[in-house]
Each structure stands twice: as structure tokens, then as C-alpha cells.
Amino acid sequence: VDGNLPFGSAAELGLTGHHALFLGEWLAQPLYLVAPKPNDARAYFSLRDQLSLPQEQFNLLARGVELNHFYQTHQFCGKCGGKTEQKSDEWAVQCQVCGFRTYPVICPCVIVAVRRGSQILLANHMRHKGGMYTTLAGFVEVGETFEEAVHREIWEETQIEVKNLRYVGNQPWAFPNSQMVGFLADYAAGEIHVQPEEIYDAQWFDCEQPLPELPPHGTIARKLIEATLVLCQQDKNKS
């Protein structure tokens, strides 16, 4: 890097001597990741605070956060323990001793909005502070399809069975390295019995009534909830 950044020089931004990693382009300008050093006292924004950005911009930020996490956690070879070095031609590290090459780890996670007639299933998760209710989600296990993960996660967390799965979309989720894969599903059977280690409370909420605090706009969870509300309204208009 020549020391010049799209919106100022490295010296002007106090980044002289920092390693810059090329991430791609934004508005025809090169975009670099510059990770702060341990003694950096400047204030930084949380990635969660940027969820309202346009999807393309948020994804670029997520890429930077995920790559930074990858390089920080793969400084040594997982095969022989040797020191690794970053590859210049791709996002990867290679062991300087045995040559083993490692690529960024991406952990797929299914996230599902379940509908029962004019109701939507929402849960208050243990990991969330406060009263926010959101969709159910969980990591895909080894040797498992996305659809199998949907059925398993919903059953484990609420004892509810679902049917009629429909893929909606996905979202990079750099907290620290997930890929959220979103589905809509219909209720099939069962009564709610929450998994206490994961879920504080889960309820069926009437789509026509005020809902509790929801996940922020920009999240795939919010997109799934809003898609379910649209389906409920469409069915109401038909009746």
C-alpha cells in the first residue's frame, strides 16, 4: 500500500505502520481492513451499530470483521503448530513449516420464523439482554442439511414440530463468523416447552396485535418476522 487511503492518508488517520488488507471495492474505491493495535485508544463503532446500513456496505464491514477474527485466531498451524503467514493472492494462511493451508471458517446457522395461522412463534433467548423476542436459530451440525437443522433446532428449543419449509435468504453474521440461513415454516404439532439452557420464554403472538420488542431492522431475523406478518395479512384479506 502506498500510504494513501480513499478518504485520507495513513498518516492523517494515524495508521502509519499498520498492516492493510485489501477487502474489495466500494464506489469504485479500494477498501482495506486496518486492524487496531492493542494500545489504540481511539473509539470504534460496534458492527451491530451498523445494521441499518445498505446490505452491500454492511457485508463489506462483516467481511473485514470476519477476516480479522480469522487471522487473529490462525497465527499458528492447526496441523503441526508452526507459524503461519498470510497469503497475498487469497484469503488464507499457510504454515511456514509443513505448508498446510487454512481458509476462513464460516459456521452456517439456520434461523426460522414459525407461523401458526395468524400467529408467529417468537422467543426471548438467554443470550439476549432485556425483553427482545426474536425467531429461533441454531448452528448446523456436521453431516446435517439445513432442513434437518431447522427441524432439530425448533424441536430442541420449543418441542414444536414444523412443516412446509421455505428458504428466504441468508446474511453474513460476523459475530464472529456465522452465515445465517433464513427459512419460513408452518406449525405442524406440539406444545411449547422451552429448552431452559437456551430459551427464557417462547410464545405464540397474534400477528394483528402489537408485538414485543423485535430485533433491529437490517437483521435477517427482522426480515423473517416481517415476511410472516405479510403472509398473515394476505390470508386475512382473502377471508
PLM features: residue spans?
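Short acidic-hydrophobic surface loop/beta-edge motif
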Residues: 21-26, 93-95, 114, 172-173
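Nudix hydrolase/Nudix homology domain
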Residues: 1-74, 129-133, 195-239
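The catalytic Nudix box helix
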Residues: 134-169, 183, 191
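Active-site-adjacent beta-strand/loop module that shapes the phosphate/pyrophosphate-binding cleft
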Residues: 171-194
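N-terminal strand-loop-strand
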Residues: 92-134, 161-162, 185
